[in-house]
Amino acid sequence: MICDDVAYREDYVDYLIEYNGETETVLDIYKDTGCVNFIDERFAVLYRPKPDDYMESFSRLEYTLFPKLYGLMDTSSVEAVGAVNVQQENILGLTGKNIIIGIIDTGIDIQNPLFQNAVGQTRILAAWDQSVPGGEQTGEFPGYGTVYTGDEINEAIRNGTSVLQDENGHGTFLAGIAAGGKTDDFTGVAPEADFVIVKLKQAKQNLRGLYGVPEDVDAYQENDIMAGVAYLTRLAERYRR
C-alpha cells in the first residue's frame, strides 16, 4: 500500500488510535489495510480507504477514533488577558532570551522584521509546513508536509520568496504578540526568543462532512495538531531549551 500522500487524500480517512508503544505490533496489524504515522509513544494516526458507510460509522465506532476539528481563537481575547501589557510594562525585565516559543497555527510572515534579528536573519530555528506535501526526506513524516531549516528560511528571505505563507494572518498576529521584536511602537512579550513554527494544513473535506463544518471555514484536525506538538517537543529536546 502506497502511503506517501494519504494525509491529503480524500479517499482515505483518518483515525486517531492509542497504542502501548509497540510500533511493530501496530504495523503488523494494519499492514494490509491501512497506513500508520506514529505521533508519539502513545498515539498514532491510522489512514484507511474511506468506507462506503463512513458517515454511518460515526455512530457505531468509538467516538475518540475520529479526530476532532478546531477553529481559530478570536484575536481580541489576547488583549483581554493582558498579554500585551506584560512586555510594555517590562517590570520583570524578561525578554525570552535562550528560550524557544512554539507556534502551531496558520503560518507566519517570514519577511516581517518582527521575526528577524538585528542583521535581518530569521529567528525561526526550524519549521514544519503541513500544507505543502513533501517527499520521503522533506516531511516530518514521509510525504506529510515540508520541513524547513533556519538556513532555508534565511535563503527565502534573501530571495524575497515566501515559505510558511500565512494566508489568514492569525499565526503571524499571535507570533508577534508572543515574541515580536522591538520597534518604536511595538514589542512582543518575549522579543528575544527564538521560534519553531508549525503551519497546520486545512482539515479534510471528508471529516468536515462528518462534523458539518462548511468548506470555507478554517478548520484543523486534532491529529495534525497533536503531530505539531510532538514535533515541537522533539525540537525542544534537540536544542535543549
Whereabouts are the PLM-identified features?
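Autoinhibitory propeptides
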Residues: 2-11, 15-100, 107-123
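Charged/polar, solvent-exposed surface patches and flexible loops
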Residues: 25-29, 126, 227, 234
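Short acidic, glycine-rich surface-loop motifs adjacent to enzyme active sites
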Residues: 69, 229-241
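Subtilisin-like serine protease catalytic core
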Residues: 90-224, 240-241
